[in-house]
From Swiss-Prot:
GO terms for biological process: methylation; rRNA processing. It comes from Pectobacterium carotovorum subsp. carotovorum (strain PC1). S-adenosyl-L-methionine binds at residues 188, 221-224, 240, 260, 277. It is an enzyme of class 2 (transferase). The gene is rlmM. Belongs to the class I-like SAM-binding methyltransferase superfamily. RNA methyltransferase RlmE family. RlmM subfamily. This is Ribosomal RNA large subunit methyltransferase M. It catalyses: cytidine(2498) in 23S rRNA + S-adenosyl-L-methionine = 2'-O-methylcytidine(2498) in 23S rRNA + S-adenosyl-L-homocysteine + H(+).
């Protein structure tokens, strides 16, 4: 198995390919990316067979911005016989992996693949039984074992392989299944909810998304992101010249400041969260977020960077490098992660967690 398969949003295959090529080189793995426009996936073919396995094991998945999922695979299985599609798949996995903990039969996230999805659901049951019979898959789901992936890109054509449960997306097709809350002011609320799922471990939600925290939402109108904070019983400073949804104001948890998000300063020094989804140039938003973190005005931040039409990966890389550099220059110890979320379009979402205070010698409380 010498291929790494990566899922992405259709239309972002070039960015995904550029990223995996760069990251692989940094891990001394060399190869080339096969890209088909609007296909929703990228195939990175390694020159050395063992490099693909090594990449999916050691290249931190959370460092990849444009990939929704990543697994090691062999060559494309073509023209699977309708009377027996299972045997070639079992043959591909035999000797490559054993005692996996989960099976996912998936398709790319495209309109063309919707019909294939129906087949995948039906096919999963007999395939799971066969893989268990051959000891490739355990008789029960086990979260700490590898995950088997079968990606159908067309009827009778699939990539077959596996990922490691500690270095992949835990979601089917790499997409969190979130339901739009009927009382939310806008669909943008799903961006922040997905960001919480992607960036913050579930067992830390009570600590880092807890009741009674103070948060600031810059560019809040009409309140899609504020809604997520209010739902978690936070007190929110919503900053926007536009109107907020009356339903949010009625909670008593929202203080609406009709002001410019680039000029607003927090009225208290115990703000934990800063969130921002303003339609502005990425460099301008990056600079603003850096200022807040350096001044110690927040401890964690989630914000969106709108992408240009061309050189999107280069623009993202540049802004993240500038952010890291500014934090480092000011002695701020922080984790920075970015992801092109399912609910993002021409934008990426960035999460920053600051560990050290802007005040010298004082460590932030967790």
């Amino acid at each position: 198995m010498n291929r790494v398969i990566l899922y992405c949003r259709p239309g972002f295959e070039k960015e995904c390919a550029a990223e995996i090529t760069e990251k692989a080189t940094q891990h001394d793995a060399y190869g080339f990316a096969r890209v088909k426009e609007n296909s929703g996936y990228v195939v990175f073919e390694c020159y050395q067979h063992e490099d693909a396995e090594r990449l999916v094991k050691t290249l931190p998945f959370h460092e990849l911005i444009f990939a929704r999922q990543m697994f090691v695979s062999g060559e494309l299985l073509r023209d699977l016989p309708p009377e027996d599609r299972i045997t070639p798949i079992v043959g591909m996995l035999s000797g490559a992996i054993e005692r996996a903990g989960e099976l996912r039969v998936e398709v790319p996230d495209t309109n063309e693949s919707k019909e294939l999805m129906k087949f995948c659901r039906k096919f999963t049951v007999p395939l799971r039984a066969a893989l268990r019979e051959h000891k490739i898959l355990l008789g029960y789901e086990k979260a700490d074992r590898p995950v088997l992936h079968v990606l159908f890109i067309a009827p009778g054509c699939c990539y077959v392989g596996y990922s490691y449960s500690n270095n992949n997306s835990p979601f089917y097709m790499g997409i969190p299944r979130l339901k739009f809350p009927s009382d939310a002011p806008s669909r943008s609320t799903l961006k922040l909810e997905e960001a919480f799922h992607v960036f913050i471990p579930a067992d830390e939600w009570d600590e880092r998304l807890g009741s009674g925290m103070y948060a600031v939402d810059l560019g809040a109108c009409p309140g899609g992101w504020t809604y997520q904070l209010v739902k978690r019983s936070m007190m929110v400073y919503a900053v926007d010249n536009g109107p907020m949804a009356p339903s949010l104001m009625e909670t008593g948890q929202v203080m609406h400041h009709q002001a410019d998000g680039f000029r607003f300063e927090p009225p208290r020094n115990n703000v934990y969260w800063l969130v921002c989804d303003m339609v502005e140039k990425p460099a301008k938003v990056t600079s603003l977020m850096s200022d807040w973190l350096i001044k110690g005005w927040c401890r964690e931040a989630i914000f969106n960077l709108k992408l240009p039409m061309k050189k999107r990966y280069e623009e993202v890389s540049h802004n993240l490098a500038v952010l890291q550099e500014r934090l480092s220059e000011n002695g701020i110890n922080a984790e920075v992660h970015a992801k092109h979320l399912y609910h993002d379009r021409e934008e990426i979402t960035v999460h920053v967690r600051r560990f050290w205070s802007a005040v010298p010698g004082r460590r932030d409380e967790r």
